[in-house]
Design a protein with these regions (language model features):
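Long, polar/Ser/Thr-enriched low-complexity segments
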Residues: 1-111
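Charged linear interaction tracts used for macromolecular binding and regulation
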Residues: 74-208
């Protein structure tokens, strides 16, 4: 504990009235005016911390996904920041995520139009998109990536490079234990070398 020698009060250790003894890094002991700390538990601050914790807890199951989709952009921390900015709804303590507004990837690669997803048989789904409406600079070598999130089980599946842009359709099989589950689905595109992605696009929910 810092000690300050006062010509009036003698040796002062810790707080004395409105003053407190403090020690600088250079070893000098001084007497400073005591300032009460700002209340860290105001209603507004508690709401902010609760919101932040909610988003972290909710997205933690997608941590490995964001290591891929936001690689070099801050990964999980970037995903949390985007969710806080665009996808959180409700007021403290009753927050929720609007998954239709969740951004799962970002970049300058072209996306696609007229996105649909539908169950076929078992736990297989068919995803369709239209590339012909895009500028000619949308590359035929671009890869398609699909994201499926089982909110009830808190499990996410990323199917990377599962088709090429011109295919305009793909059927994929999801885990058998997901039968009957409601899934959130997204699509994004990436260059052939994986160096850049498109902005993710929410397709819709689909029940297996």
């Amino acid at each position: 504990m810092s000690t300050f020698v006062s010509t009036t009060f003698g040796k002062i250790s810790g707080r004395h009235g409105s003053a407190v003894a403090a020690k600088y890094r250079n070893g000098m002991n001084v007497l400073k005016v005591f300032t009460a700390p700002f209340n860290p538990k105001s209603v507004k601050q508690v709401a902010v911390r609760t919101k932040f914790k909610f988003v972290i807890d909710t997205l933690l199951c997608m941590n490995k996904l964001f290591m891929i989709t936001f690689h070099g952009l801050g990964e999980f921390h970037h995903a949390v920041s985007l969710a806080l900015k665009y996808a959180v709804t409700g007021t403290s303590p009753n927050f929720s995520l609007d998954y239709t507004k969740m951004i799962m990837s970002q970049g300058t690669v072209y996306g696609a139009e007229q996105l649909t997803v539908a169950k076929t048989t078992g736990t297989s789904v068919k995803v369709d998109w239209v590339s012909s409406l895009l500028p000619a600079t949308a590359l035929a070598t671009d890869n398609v990536n699909l994201i499926f999130f089982n909110e009830a089980k808190k499990v996410v599946v990323l199917l990377q490079n599962c088709a090429l842009r011109p295919a305009d359709t793909i059927e994929v099989e999801l885990p058998a234990e997901w039968a009957g589950a409601n899934l959130h689905t997204w699509i994004y595109f990436s260059l052939a070398d994986g160096s850049h992605n498109s902005l993710s696009e929410y397709i819709s929910q689909v029940q297996l």
